[in-house]
């Protein structure tokens, strides 16, 4: 049995996370289900892709990564399982782009699972099947794989080259872009270097590169190599997003 690591933008105010975990528990009662994140910004694929990139190196190899950030739910976008050192289940919308830089998938399958049925329902009532694929499509597939069952039982195999990817690239520089922001307002960039003592330019500002936040005065901007190995821009005890007016996709340049 393999553990399942579950990431979504469902939040915790509604029962969506619990319902998905209930389906997992019913179909695969043995494997552990570990929450990666559920308070991601709704429908933000770049933020979710970064969260998976940040977490993946610390997950046990062979684990099932169930990720549901799915703006196109119910449309023609595909539902997939992809197999590498880890196993990925989710929408084929680029969500796994950065994770697959670390772990390129070797095989991929379209998902055609049976849909879970509710244990109680009003007479003549049936749940909608187009808006909750986390429950109806991805959870059954993740449970199947967590039990070690063959992926061929999920649906037809497809070439891994056809899997969707976001137009993102990590680079040594000198130019990159703001990839996303964490909850503190720190800007995570696509740059893989942060030469201490140098500077970066972003949002029309020249920002010093240091090892950590406390090496600049409170309220001052600073760039540094973040915990996931990407250059980040922060404001010591503040929000770089707000204080510097930064936005996703904004150019960043090593000076």
UniProtKB/Swiss-Prot annotation:
<feature type="site" description="Important for activity">
    <location>
        <position position="77"/>
    </location>
</feature>
<feature type="site" description="Important for activity">
    <location>
        <position position="133"/>
    </location>
</feature>
<dbReference type="GO" id="GO:0016787">
    <property type="term" value="F:hydrolase activity"/>
</dbReference>
<comment type="subunit">
    <text>Homotrimer.</text>
</comment>
<dbReference type="InterPro" id="IPR046469">
    <property type="entry name" value="SAM_HAT_N"/>
</dbReference>
<dbReference type="Pfam" id="PF20257">
    <property type="entry name" value="SAM_HAT_C"/>
</dbReference>
<feature type="binding site">
    <location>
        <position position="232"/>
    </location>
    <ligand>
        <name>(R)-S-adenosyl-L-methionine</name>
    </ligand>
</feature>
<dbReference type="InterPro" id="IPR023228">
    <property type="entry name" value="SAM_OH_AdoTrfase_N_sf"/>
</dbReference>
<protein>
    <recommendedName>
        <fullName>(R)-S-adenosyl-L-methionine hydrolase</fullName>
        <ecNumber>3.13.2.3</ecNumber>
    </recommendedName>
</protein>
<feature type="site" description="Important for activity">
    <location>
        <position position="70"/>
    </location>
</feature>
<keyword id="KW-0378">Hydrolase</keyword>
<feature type="binding site">
    <location>
        <position position="70"/>
    </location>
    <ligand>
        <name>adenosine</name>
    </ligand>
</feature>
<dbReference type="InterPro" id="IPR023227">
    <property type="entry name" value="SAM_OH_AdoTrfase_C_sf"/>
</dbReference>
<feature type="binding site">
    <location>
        <position position="235"/>
    </location>
    <ligand>
        <name>adenosine</name>
    </ligand>
</feature>
<comment type="similarity">
    <text>Belongs to the SAM hydrolase / SAM-dependent halogenase family.</text>
</comment>
<feature type="binding site">
    <location>
        <position position="235"/>
    </location>
    <ligand>
        <name>(R)-S-adenosyl-L-methionine</name>
    </ligand>
</feature>
<feature type="binding site">
    <location>
        <position position="227"/>
    </location>
    <ligand>
        <name>(R)-S-adenosyl-L-methionine</name>
    </ligand>
</feature>
<feature type="binding site">
    <location>
        <position position="9"/>
    </location>
    <ligand>
        <name>adenosine</name>
    </ligand>
</feature>
<dbReference type="InterPro" id="IPR046470">
    <property type="entry name" value="SAM_HAT_C"/>
</dbReference>
<feature type="binding site">
    <location>
        <position position="186"/>
    </location>
    <ligand>
        <name>(R)-S-adenosyl-L-methionine</name>
    </ligand>
</feature>
<comment type="function">
    <text>Catalyzes the hydrolysis of S-adenosyl-L-methionine (SAM) into adenosine and L-methionine. Does not have chlorinase or fluorinase activity.</text>
</comment>
<keyword id="KW-0949">S-adenosyl-L-methionine</keyword>
<dbReference type="Pfam" id="PF01887">
    <property type="entry name" value="SAM_HAT_N"/>
</dbReference>
<feature type="binding site">
    <location>
        <position position="186"/>
    </location>
    <ligand>
        <name>adenosine</name>
    </ligand>
</feature>
<dbReference type="InterPro" id="IPR002747">
    <property type="entry name" value="SAM_OH_AdoTrfase"/>
</dbReference>
């Amino acid at each position: 049995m393999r553990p399942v690591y579950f990431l979504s933008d469902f939040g915790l105010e509604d029962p969506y996370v619990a319902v998905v975990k209930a389906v997992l528990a019913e179909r695969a009662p043995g494997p552990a289900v570990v929450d990666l994140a559920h308070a991601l910004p709704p429908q933000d694929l770049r933020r979710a892709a970064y969260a998976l990139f940040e977490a993946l190196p610390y997950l046990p190899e062979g684990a099932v990564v169930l990720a549901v950030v799915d703006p196109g739910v119910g449309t023609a976008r595909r539902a997939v399982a992809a197999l590498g050192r880890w196993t990925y289940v989710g929408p084929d919308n680029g969500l796994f782009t950065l994770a697959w830089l670390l772990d390129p998938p070797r095989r991929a399958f379209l998902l055609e699972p049976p849909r879970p049925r509710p244990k109680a329902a009003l007479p003549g009532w049936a749940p909608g099947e187009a808006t909750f694929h986390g429950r109806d499509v991805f959870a059954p597939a993740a449970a199947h794989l967590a039990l070690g069952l063959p992926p061929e039982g999920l649906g037809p195999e497809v070439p891994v080259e056809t899997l969707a990817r976001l137009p993102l690239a990590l680079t040594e520089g000198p130019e990159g872009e703001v990839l996303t922001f964490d909850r503190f307002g720190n800007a995570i960039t696509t740059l893989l270097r942060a030469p201490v003592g140098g500077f970066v330019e972003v949002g029309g500002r020249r920002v010093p590169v240091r090892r950590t936040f406390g090496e600049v005065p409170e309220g001052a901007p600073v760039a540094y190599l973040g915990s996931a190995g990407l250059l980040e821009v922060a404001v010591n005890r503040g929000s770089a997003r707000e204080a510097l007016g930064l936005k996703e996709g904004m150019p960043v340049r090593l000076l």
